[in-house]
Amino acid sequence: MMIYYRTVRLGDTDAAGVVYFATALSICHEAYEASLEQAYINLRKFFNDPEQAIPIVHGEIDFFRPLFCGEKLEIHLLARQLKDSEFEIEYQIFKGSSEGEKAARALTRHVCINPISRQRSRLPDLMVQWLARINTTESERLY
């Protein structure tokens, strides 16, 4: 499991002063990107690879508590490989720390494809290694 720390910023909130669902999913994606960087994956090369793309094909989020500007978040990421071309990431979002209130739970599902043919392809070795690393019992903390 990886743990990502984040502060809710004013720009993350809507007119009602709370984090909007699309923004919460964006924060989850930010945590995903940080976990890739922690695994020494070059994000520029990863997201611009002409041989492969790994788009999100499904996303969901459930809120249990509102998130307000200035609140500190602790986001737990746990990923699992579903197929040789597919994985999902579960995010648990806590206010303050995991001992605090659970504010939300999100899920994103990703599929590896060839960007030209748009056909599924096997996850690259670096992603299989990332999946193994993120699922170790020892937590890695990301800031």
Curated annotation (Swiss-Prot):
Active site annotation, chain numbering: D14
Hydrolase among keywords: yes
Top-level taxonomic group: Bacteria
Pathway in which the depicted protein is active: Cofactor biosynthesis; phylloquinone biosynthesis; Quinol/quinone metabolism; 1,4-dihydroxy-2-naphthoate biosynthesis; 1,4-dihydroxy-2-naphthoate from chorismate: step 7/7
Catalytic reaction equation(s): 1,4-dihydroxy-2-naphthoyl-CoA + H2O = 1,4-dihydroxy-2-naphthoate + CoA + H(+)
GO biological process, one term: phylloquinone biosynthetic process
Protein name as catalogued: 1,4-dihydroxy-2-naphthoyl-CoA hydrolase
